[in-house]
């Protein structure tokens, strides 16, 4: 699932 505009959840 997209998270913060990326495929993986990363610090914004």
From Swiss-Prot:
The modification Cysteine amide is found at residue 12. The modification Methionine sulfoxide is found at residue 8. Keywords: Amidation, Disulfide bond, Hydroxylation, Neurotoxin, Oxidation, Secreted, Toxin. It is found in: Secreted. GO terms for molecular function: toxin activity. Disulfide bonds join 3-12, 4-9. Chi-conotoxins inhibit the neuronal noradrenaline transporter (NET/SLC6A2). This is Chi-conotoxin-like 1. It comes from Conus textile.
